[in-house]
């Protein structure tokens, strides 16, 4: 497969994507800078106690300004593309719906799977580029023996973003460059400084791009109010693992598996959310040791290093962003509706396996695939 020399760089206004642009320009690529405008940061400000946008936070107008300034410094054309309507339908609405159904979603993975890479590649082609480049910490390469593109963990494990990228298709992987995969974050900042990028020391964003201060409960209230909707009544019982009713709660959207604070009940020892039943609205709580899970399932799996899961295999499985992958046996099964799922059994039970999060399967550095925890 041959590509032209033009690459569209996804520019977020941060140090990583800006450094990617500087590196590729130095390597002789013809570049186009693209920023996807995903959310109006002022849209819900002041509604139901939502704060004003914080200057310099992820996806803000300040980031757009920084991205444009870097493009001008490097002498590359720059375009801001409005994707707010699709972001709302493909990311924000599902995010809200998942919480209302007692699950804990990952908006970054939803965005990568359903919007960002599709739209970046579409826009890149419109501007004459065959490929895109992003500032993700990941690596990819083509394996001719398997005839597949492989996604691999980066050199800087502390910045590993492959957990968020498990949904990438072979086509997307073949047309994406991850120039930072072989570098550590301090090295990237040094490269940025070498290229005299003004934002070499700009702090990383640690929050969900469309939710100020990470207060998702307030966001859900404000968003539904704006839509003329209200939070469905999901009040119910807080129960122990033996079924004893310990109290009542105001709604299942207020909880996530593993949560300790804000349960509304007292006990001699700390209690944690073990399970959320969206049908009965029951929230089961228990001890930290009861939070461990040995076997669970994942749906809507995407396979990367293999074409499909046809039999039982060993893998290291990661169940949240900061979780160290743990050894497990993964086998294909059928869900209640007959669709394909993966059943995962850990060698050692793992803490807080959370519905709505993703389970990503690794073979050392390689991403085998991943799916959504049910």
Curated annotation (Swiss-Prot):
GO cellular component: cytoplasm
Primary subcellular site in the record, as a coarse category: cytoplasm
Keyword Phosphoprotein set for record: no
Enzyme type, top EC level: transferase
GO biological process: tRNA wobble position uridine thiolation
Residues holding ATP: 10-17, 36, 135
Annotated site residue numbers, Interaction with tRNA: 136, 357
Active site: 111 (nucleophile), 209 (cysteine persulfide intermediate)
Pfam families in UniProt: tRNA_Me_trans, tRNA_Me_trans_C, tRNA_Me_trans_M
InterPro entries reported for this sequence: MnmA-like (IPR004506), MnmA-like_C (IPR046885), MnmA-like_central (IPR046884), MnmA-like_central_sf (IPR023382), Rossmann-like_a/b/a_fold (IPR014729)
Role noted for this protein: Catalyzes the 2-thiolation of uridine at the wobble position (U34) of tRNA, leading to the formation of s(2)U34.
Name of protein: tRNA-specific 2-thiouridylase MnmA
């Amino acid at each position: 497969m041959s590509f032209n020399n033009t690459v569209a760089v996804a520019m977020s206004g941060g140090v990583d994507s800006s450094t990617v642009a500087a590196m590729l320009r130095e390597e002789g690529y013809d570049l186009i800078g693209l920023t996807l405008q995903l959310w109006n940061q002022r849209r819900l400000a002041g509604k139901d106690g939502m704060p004003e946008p914080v200057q310099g936070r992820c996806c803000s107008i300040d980031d757009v300004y920084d991205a444009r300034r870097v493009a001008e410094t490097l002498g590359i054309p720059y375009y801001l593309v409005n994707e707010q309507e699709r972001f709302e339908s493909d990311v924000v609405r599902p995010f809200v719906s998942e919480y209302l159904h007692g699950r804990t979603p990952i908006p970054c993975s939803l965005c990568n799977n359903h919007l960002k890479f599709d739209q970046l590649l579409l826009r890149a082609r419109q501007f004459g580029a065959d490929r895109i480049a992003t500032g993700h910490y990941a690596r990819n390469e083509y394996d001719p023996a398997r005839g597949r593109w492989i996604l691999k963990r980066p050199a800087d494990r502390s910045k590993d973003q492959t957990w968020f990228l498990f949904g990438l298709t072979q086509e997307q992987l073949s047309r994406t460059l991850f120039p930072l995969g072989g570098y550590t974050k301090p090295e990237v900042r040094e490269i940025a400084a070498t290229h005299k990028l003004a934002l070499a020391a700009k702090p990383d964003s640690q929050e969900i791009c469309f939710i100020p201060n990470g207060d998702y409960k307030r966001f859900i209230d404000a968003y539904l109010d704006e839509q003329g909707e209200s939070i469905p009544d999901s009040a119910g019982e807080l129960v122990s693992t033996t079924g004893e009713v310990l109290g009542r709660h105001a709604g299942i959207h207020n909880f996530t598996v593993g949560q300790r604070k804000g349960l509304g009940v007292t006990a001699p020892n700390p209690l944690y959310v073990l399970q959320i039943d969206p049908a009965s609205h029951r929230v089961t709580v228990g001890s930290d040791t009861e939070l461990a899970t040995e076997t669970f399932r994942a749906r809507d799996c995407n396979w990367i290093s293999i074409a499909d899961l046809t039999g039982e295999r060993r893998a290291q499985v990661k169940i949240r962003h900061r979780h160290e992958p743990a050894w497990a046996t993964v086998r294909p099964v059928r869900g209640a509706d007959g669709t394909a799922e993966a059943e995962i059994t850990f060698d050692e039970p793992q803490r807080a396996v959370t519905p709505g999060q993703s389970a990503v399967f690794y073979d050392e550095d390689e991403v085998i695939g991943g799916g959504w925890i049910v």
